């Protein structure tokens, strides 16, 4: 039996539209005795909301099986004064963090979504305010640094572009709290009481999921859904341990290879 980390966006759904076979795959994995943890860089909705959306797709999971980056941020930044450029829906997840508009000790950048709120969160004035705080000595944190994400309308620009802009302007480097950071993967392993070498990461992102997990000694499986692009995989130096058509194929693949 294995410990398995499962990405969500692009693996189980795209823009809320389920990818066929996901719910059945999770049931089969549980029946086979595998230990599962759902790990996501989604930074636009609260954990309870994300978990409920997955259950509505027929995917059986408890809230505490879902690991999110806003909660990682709350743990890291507890007790600190933070200027947070995030979607309103996750503000409640930042428990213990003192959210401020000035004199911040840290600047926290969240993710984008497909709603008009993104235009407000990442407005020029908000980015300029974040830059001002960084110049005054605040430390830059990012929930993730994804360049783009896949939607039903095609790829959309993600928050990594704004993080890179602030890094360039303030001549600093962001501390990434989600995938592919070491602390995020270590938290997942600890939750499963698993060793890296006996753990599989399943995802659609060759960088955040596959390269990140391999960098921490895990085995990896790339799905041909979501962000998967054959040309990017071909050009990459990263080679997953397996490539499958979709999450639906995972139980059978593991039966053949474990």
Predicted regions and their residues:
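Asp-based, Mg2+/Mn2+-dependent phosphohydrolase catalytic module
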Residues: 2-34, 43-258
């Amino acid at each position: 039996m294995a410990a398995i980390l499962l990405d969500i966006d692009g693996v189980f759904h795209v823009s809320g539209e389920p990818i066929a076979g996901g719910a059945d795959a999770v049931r089969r994995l549980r029946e086979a005795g595998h230990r599962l943890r759902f790990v996501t860089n989604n930074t636009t909705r609260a954990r309870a909301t994300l978990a409920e959306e997955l259950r509505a797709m027929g995917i059986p999971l408890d809230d505490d099986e879902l690991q999110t980056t806003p909660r990682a941020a709350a743990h890291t930044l507890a007790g600190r004064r933070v200027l947070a450029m995030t979607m309103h829906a996750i503000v409640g997840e930042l428990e213990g963090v003192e959210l401020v508009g000035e004199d911040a000790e840290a600047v926290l950048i969240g993710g984008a979504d497909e709603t008009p709120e993104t235009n407000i969160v990442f407005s020029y004035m908000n980015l300029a305010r974040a830059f001002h705080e960084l110049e005054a000595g605040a430390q830059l944190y990012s929930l993730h640094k994804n360049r783009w994400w896949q939607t039903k309308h095609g790829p959309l620009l993600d928050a990594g572009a704004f993080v890179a802009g602030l890094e360039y302007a303030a001549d600093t480097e962001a501390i990434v709290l989600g995938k592919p950071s070491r602390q995020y993967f270590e938290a997942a392993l600890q939750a499963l009481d698993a060793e890296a070498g006996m753990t599989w990461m399943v995802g659609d992102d060759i960088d955040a999921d596959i390269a990140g997990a391999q960098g921490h000694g895990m085995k990896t499986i790339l799905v041909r859904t979501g962000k998967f692009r054959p040309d990017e995989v071909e050009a990459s130096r990263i080679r997953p341990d397996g490539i499958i058509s979709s999450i639906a194929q995972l139980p059978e693949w593991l039966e053949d290879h474990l």
